[in-house]
């Protein structure tokens, strides 16, 4: 059993944060909320998604797992007004999700969860440095780096967080000191990341006040922020690239 | 003789409602206004257009017929500001239309009406059901249906008007009861229509308060609404598709 | 030595006015400001650009010449907010320009000026007619002409300035009398210009109050207006086309 109602804009944003990683996902539904863990097809980026029941206007659920094509949901939500309420109900017999938005009733066939890549194990990482910054600052640095290169260095040096991209001839660097950051835990950290992935991942951060980055030396980065006004959370784990120079 | 002046925005909207059916049309000009009847090249959709002289700021005309390339007019009106006045005068000797918009004088060669498909005969149909609804509701249902399928069922069942589209696995349905509609004349009606055509036809309805649909059982649909603040009217007649299941 | 700070929007607009002519330019830097003279690869249009030191928030420079790829600068400025200050400093040793925008530090490799086409000689022309008009009027006429043809006649006849484009069947003409113009110096003038070039050149004039056109009979046109709130000036010299009819 699963029956829920949620604001359309809020669901759209939550789905968008997942869709940057994968197209088809297993939603793990529990009485306390919905969670997803997924890796991208190339095994470079992982998304860990949690949306608590308090994000919903109505929510009642037994434990179950459903398979969703995120593109279809995104498409359907494109019709909704931002203040519409989206009502969902699982029809277990037919394996369909009934979705009602502003008078329109959708009957969405679900995917068989067993055909979707299994939930990955989240590695336990010791990431010594932590940086909390405004999402718009992060996005701006990534956009600037894209103009120059296809990868970007991120690190902490003393009390300064930095992002740097080098092209064949040009270079861009952003440095933020402790006073420009929301929080900083100093630690040895410097890793190189693919901008292909970073660009997608930071897209939803533009409206986010606090994004937490956890970093190490040639280690994955953990990019982490609240969604749904604090009722949910998305974390991305992105593998580093090996520096070739 | 034909000489007229009209608000640019109003003319743009009127032309746009015709352009969804055909590119080249015969304008029938009379002292009381302008009318067009045209079918699309595939004989699936017909447009019946009327723009009374009261839609114009100035209007004086003898009976005549001119051939117009709607794409050219649309292009030229693209330069106009929405509050500009468009002045038109027919130069019968040279078969040109002189158009003046905000100081720019266009000389537009007219098409020979005899090279344009003749005005079609409008079939007399007995369409038992009639639905009056808000144009934005109609457009929204058609946009939702497009996500799912390339055709759409429209019908009346008891006191309910419904639109439904079925894809290979998914389905969308909008039901509107008598109290959600502006008016309803119940009657047996259920026909299937191509979304290729419906999408174009409902595009101009977004700003229209009242759209009248006349429906029957496997019969054409008549989609009908006012243009030019009531000084004109456009009706579309769209042939049904045969249901294949 | 070259060190300067300038409003991002102002620099963006100034660069855009140059970029319609060429991609790579030699900036001539002097204590009193920056100047550029460049011709397009086909030798049809010339741009003469001047940006005085008063356009800058800070400015100090010795005489020097640097080679710039305008596309790169445009790209970088795309990240800036309109009220950001852009700080630039020349690093002569490495032949790089250090650019700082809102905390982001770019290191931009400069081009070797000797690899860029030398500054052209500006021909001394006797252009008998002069027209001063609003930039938006000019742009509107050019946009209308594009719908009809790929070249455009511009001239002065008595006290009237006119622009005219003829297509195979259609024609558009704008006439502006002395009272609709900001200023007019009558003189024999009528020349034909390629709309490919005019379209680009008039793009920046949309926000410009006064554009001065200097014209002759089958002569180049000089299109001239202030940039940077009067602290700079851009002039375009466009060669005429030979009328083929």
UniProtKB/Swiss-Prot annotation, chains A, B, C:
The keyword DNA-binding applies. Keywords: DNA replication, DNA-binding. Disulfide bonds: none annotated. The keyword Calcium does not apply. GO terms for biological process: leading strand elongation; regulation of DNA replication. One of its GO terms (molecular function) is DNA binding. It comes from the Archaea. Belongs to the PCNA family. HAMAP family: DNApol_clamp_arch. Homotrimer. The subunits circularize to form a toroid; DNA passes through its center. Replication factor C (RFC) is required to load the toroid on the DNA. Sliding clamp subunit that acts as a moving platform for DNA processing. Responsible for tethering the catalytic subunit of DNA polymerase and other proteins to DNA during high-speed replication. PANTHER family: PROLIFERATING CELL NUCLEAR ANTIGEN (PTHR11352:SF0). This is DNA polymerase sliding clamp. It comes from Methanosarcina mazei (strain ATCC BAA-159 / DSM 3647 / Goe1 / Go1 / JCM 11833 / OCM 88).
């Amino acid at each position: 059993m699963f029956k829920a109602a949620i604001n359309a804009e809020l669901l759209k944003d939550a789905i968008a944060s997942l869709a940057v990683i994968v197209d088809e996902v297993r939603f793990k539904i529990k009485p306390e909320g919905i969670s997803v863990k997924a890796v991208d097809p190339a095994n470079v980026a992982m998304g860990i998604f949690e949306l608590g029941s308090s994000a919903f206007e109505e929510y009642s659920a037994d434990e179950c797992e459903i398979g969703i094509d995120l593109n279809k949901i995104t498409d359907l939500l494109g019709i909704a007004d931002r203040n519409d309420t989206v009502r969902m109900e699982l029809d277990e017999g037919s394996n369909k999700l009934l979705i009602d938005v502003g008078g329109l009733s959708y009957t969405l066939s679900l995917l068989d969860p067993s055909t979707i890549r299994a939930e990955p194990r989240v590695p336990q990482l010791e990431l010594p440095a932590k940086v909390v910054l405004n999402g718009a600052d992060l996005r701006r640095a990534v956009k600037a780096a894209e103009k120059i290169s296809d990868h970007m260095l991120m690190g902490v040096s003393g009390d300064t967080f930095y992002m740097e991209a080098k092209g064949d001839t040009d270079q861009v660097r952003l440095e933020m000191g402790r006073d420009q950051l929301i929080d900083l835990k100093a630690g040895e950290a410097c890793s190189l990341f693919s901008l292909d992935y970073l660009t997608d991942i930071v897209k939803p951060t533009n409206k986010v006040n606090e994004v937490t980055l956890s970093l190490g030396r040639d280690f994955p980065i953990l990019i982490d922020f609240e969604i749904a006004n604090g009722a949910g959370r998305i974390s991305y784990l992105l593998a580093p690239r090996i520096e070739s120079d």
